[in-house]
Design a protein with these regions (language model features):
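Beta-lactamase-like hydrolase cores
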Residues: 326-373
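Boundary regions of SH3-family modules and the immediately adjacent low-complexity/disordered segments
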Residues: 36-44, 89-118, 131, 157-201
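Beta-loop motif signature
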Residues: 39-42, 48-78, 119-156, 210
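Aromatic- and glycine-rich peptidoglycan recognition patches
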Residues: 131-137, 251-254, 280-329, 582-584, ...
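Mid-domain, small-residue-enriched loop/turn segments at the edges of structured enzyme/sensor domains
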Residues: 353, 436-440, 444, 450, ...
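Catalytic cysteine-centered active-site loop
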Residues: 209-224, 228-261, 523
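Structured C-terminal helix/loop/strand segments within mature extracytoplasmic catalytic/sensor domains
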Residues: 320-346, 462-464, 507-538, 543-546, ...
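SH3/SH3-like beta-barrel superfamily modules
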Residues: 66-99, 139-177
C-alpha cells in the first residue's frame, strides 16, 4: 500500500545549488560502491529521488502492490517510461515503477570536493530558515536520506543548535540541525563497524510498524529492516530475503551452531524463503514481523513462528572470526562421502538403477555411483554433436550462419540405404522449413533446446558421427559413443546404438564450459544453448525455486531410460556438473515418474551440499 506520509515533489528552481545537485551522481552509489552487488549494464539515464519517502510499485499504477521504497537523494536508473510513471532499477537491483513526480532527471558526475549531509537520526526536519520555531518544516526525511552540503552555521538561529544548509534534489535549499546528520565527503565509504553497533542501530526502530515494502522508520518489512541496518553501515544488500539467502555476494553461509550476533537467519518452507531476522545472541532475534503487535520486535528464536521454519543462516562477509572461511565450502571430501550416501538412498527407494556423477568445478572434488554403467544415450548424445559443430566453427570450416538444406531423408549406418524419421511436436519449428534451408545455428539450437530429432539428423549428417566421436574422445569422454542418426532402425536392430555412462557424459558437460579445446566464444555459445533448454522437469526442478542458479543441460528420454546431464551455475559464479542417468525403472509411466522424482530429490541434495557452510 502507498505511504500516506510521502510528500509531493515541488517544481525545481535553477539555483547554483541546484546545479551542483544535478551534478551529483548519487551519494548512495559511490558511498556503497565497494559493497554493492555486481553492477547491471550501464544505464541509459539516471535520476535522483526528490520525495522524502517514495513507494515503488509492481505496475505503473499507485493502486498496485508496493514492491520497495526509495528515499530522498537515492539514485535510480531509468529503464522505460509510460504515462506519468518510470520503470526504474534501484542501487540494490530492484526493478519497479515510480511516479514521475518523484524524480529529478539529468544526473551527471559530481564535482570534486562535493560533500553531503546524510541523515543519521531516525528523522530530520528540513526548514526554510535555521530555526525550529519560525515556520513548519519543508519536509521530514528519514535516516539514510542525503542532501548536498552548502554551508555550516554555528547557532545562528537562536535555537542553541548548529545548522547545516543543504540543497534538496528538487532544487530548493533548506536547513537541518547538524545533530541530525553526518557531513561526509562524496567519495567516503561508510564504515562496516561492529555487530554491536548494527544491533544498537537496529534497536532504535523498536516499535516501528510492519509495512510491506517499507525501508524506513515509518514502517519496515523484514528484509527492509535488515537492508536499512546494513546500508547505514556500508553494506548494500539485495532487497528481498530470498535474494539475501541465496544470491547476495556480501553474505556467506554459516552453521547455526556457529552463529554470532549480527548474523542473519532465514525462514520459510522447503521451497520458499519469506522471512528473516538478525541474531542477537542468547536465543534472541531482532525482526520486523506481522506476528503479535506487527512491527519491529525483539523476539525469542524458539517461538512457534520462527524455530520450526528456520532454513538457513548467513553472515556479512568480513564479520567472521580470524582464520574462519568466508564462503560455501562446496564439495569437500567429507561432504562428498555424506552426499553419496544420501544419493544412494534416494536411488534405492526409486526402483530405478541410476548412474550418478557429481563434480564441483571449483574444488575439483567429485563423487560417483555406477558411473561406468553404460546405457542407451537417448538425446544426451546431442551435446557432443553440438560441441563438434562449435569446434569446426572455431576452425573456420563451418559458420553458424551457413544455410543447410532441410529434408527428411538420411542414410543408414548399416548400408547407406535411405530412411526418414517420424516427426513429433519437438520437430515443429524445423519441420516448417522442410524443402527450404535453415541456418546451422537454428538447427543446433533446435537439436538441444527442443531436442528435435530432425534437426539432430541434419546436423549429424553434416559433421559425421565419426568426427563427433573423435572429438568426444579428445575431450576425455571415450565411453560416450555417437554411432548413428536418430531412428536408424537397421542399425538399432544390429545393436548399433548411441551409448553413454555417467562419467563420460560428465566429461562432455564439463568440456562444454571449461575445455581449452574450445574457444571462449564457443564455450559461451554452448552455455547459451544448453541454458535455453525447454525440458526442465528433472535437475532444474529439483533446485530451490528462489536459488538464482542457472542450469545448462540436456535431457534424454526413451522407453527404457530417463537422463539429465547438466552444469549448474550458482549466483556466486561457482559451477558444478551433475549427471543422472536412469534405467531399469519398469519402462512404464509410474516407474518413469518415480525416476524423475528421484532425480529432483538428488538435484536438491547436491545443491544443498554446494551452498552449505
Amino acid at each position: 500500500m502507498r505511504d500516506s506520509m510521502t510528500p509531493a515533489s515541488h517544481a525545481a528552481r535553477h539555483t547554483p545549488l541546484a546545479a551542483t545537485l544535478l551534478a551529483l551522481l548519487s551519494f548512495e552509489e559511490n558511498l556503497l560502491l565497494a559493497a554493492a552487488p555486481a553492477a547491471p549494464p550501464a544505464p541509459q539515464e539516471t535520476a535522483i529521488i526528490t520525495a522524502a519517502v517514495q513507494d515503488l510499485f509492481t505496475r505503473p499504477d499507485e493502486t498496485s502492490s508496493v514492491d520497495d521504497q526509495v528515499i530522498l537523494g537515492e539514485r535510480v536508473e531509468i529503464l522505460e517510461d509510460t504515462a506519468g510513471f518510470a520503470r526504474v532499477r534501484t542501487a540494490a537491483g530492484e526493478v519497479a515503477w515510480i511516479p514521475e513526480r518523484a524524480l529529478r532527471r539529468g544526473v551527471t558526475p559530481a564535482p570534486a570536493g562535493t560533500k553531503v549531509a546524510r541523515v543519521t537520526s531516525n528523522f530530520a526536519h528540513v526548514y526554510a530558515s535555521p530555526s525550529f520555531t519560525a515556520q513548519k518544516p519543508l519536509l521530514s526525511v528519514p535516516v539514510g536520506a542525503t542532501m548536498v552540503l552548502s554551508d555550516f552555521l554555528e547557532d545562528k538561529g537562536g535555537d542553541a543548535s548548529s545548522w547545516v544548509r543543504v540543497g534538496l534534489p528538487d532544487g530548493r535549499s533548506g536547513f537541518v540541525a547538524s545533530r541530525d546528520v553526518a557531513l561526509l565527503p562524496f567519495e567516503e565509504n561508510l564504515p562496516l563497524r561492529s555487530p554491536s553497533e548494527w544491533i544498537s542501530f537496529g534497536k532504535r526502530f523498536l516499535g516501528a510498524p510492519y509495512t510491506w515494502g517499507g525501508t524506513t522508520p515509518l514502517g519496515f518489512d523484514c528484509s527492509g529492516l535488515v537492508q536499512r541496518i546494513f546500508r547505514e553501515h556500508g553494506v548494500l544488500l539485495k532487497r528481498n530475503s530470498y535474494e539475501q539467502a541465496f544470491q547476495d555476494s556480501r553474505l556467506v553461509p554459516v552453521s547455526f551452531d556457529k552463529l554470532q550476533p549480527g548474523d542473519l537467519l532465514f525462514f520459510g518452507t522447503e521451497d520458499k524463503i519469506d522471512h528473516e531476522a538478525m541474531w542477537l545472541g542468547d536465543g534472541m532475534v531482532l525482526q520486523s514481523t506481522r506476528h503479535g503487535v506487527p512491527g519491529v520486535q525483539v523476539t525469542r528464536y524458539d517461538s512457534p513462528f520462527l524455530k520450526p521454519l528456520f532454513r538457513y543462516a548467513r553472515r556479512v562477509r568480513g564479520n567472521s572470526s580470524k582464520g574462519e572461511e568466508e564462503k560455501a565450502s562446496g564439495l569437500t571430501r567429507a561432504r562428498a562421502r555424506d552426499l553419496e550416501a544420501v544419493l544412494r538412498g534416494i536411488a534405492a527407494s526409486s526402483g530405478a538403477r541410476f548412474g550418478i556423477y557429481v563434480k564441483d568445478l571449483t574444488t575439483g572434488s567429485s563423487l560417483s555411483r555406477n558411473s561406468s554403467l553404460s546405457m542407451h544415450a537417448a538425446s544426451t548424445m546431442k551435446t557432443p554433436v553440438m560441441l563438434e559443430v562449435l569446434r569446426r566453427v572455431d576452425a573456420g570450416t563451418l559458420s553458424l550462419s551457413d544455410e543447410i538444406p532441410v529434408k527428411n531423408e538420411f542414410k543408414s549406418l548399416v548400408d547407406g540405404s535411405p530412411f526418414s524419421i517420424g516427426l513429433e511436436e519437438s520437430d515443429a519449428p524445423t519441420m516448417k522449413k522442410l524443402g527450404g534451408k535453415a541456418s546451422l545455428e537454428f538447427l543446433v539450437t533446435e537439436m538441444i533446446v527442443r531436442s528435435s530429432s530432425l534437426a539432430t539428423n541434419l546436423v549429424l549428417s553434416l559433421v559425421g558421427a565419426e568426427n563427433v566421436q573423435a572429438f568426444t574422445d579428445a575431450l576425455g569422454a571415450p565411453t560416450v559413443k555417437v554411432r548413428r542418426c536418430v531412428e536408424d532402425s537397421k542399425a538399432f536392430d544390429l545393436g548399433l546404438n548411441n551409448e553413454t555412462d555417467a562419467a563420460g557424459m560428465a566429461a562432455v558437460m564439463e568440456a562444454a564450459v571449461r575445455s581449452p579445446k574450445l574457444s571462449a566464444a564457443a564455450r559461451a555459445k554452448a552455455w547459451e544453448i544448453l541454458a535455453g533448454q525447454t525440458f526442465n522437469e528433472e535437475i532444474p526442478a529439483g533446485l530451490h525455486p528462489q536459488s538464482g542458479a542457472v542450469v545448462g543441460h540436456k535431457t534424454g528420454s526413451i522407453s527404457s531410460v530417463e537422463h539429465d546431464a547438466s552444469v549448474v551455475r550458482l549466483p556466486d559464479g561457482r559451477e558444478y556438473v551433475l549427471v543422472l542417468l536412469a534405467n531399469d525403472f519398469g519402462a512404464n509411466e509410474e516407474g518413469r515418474r518415480k525416476a524423475i522424482d528421484a532425480a529432483r530429490k538428488m538435484s536438491r541434495a547436491v545443491w544443498e551440499a554446494m551452498i552449505a557452510p
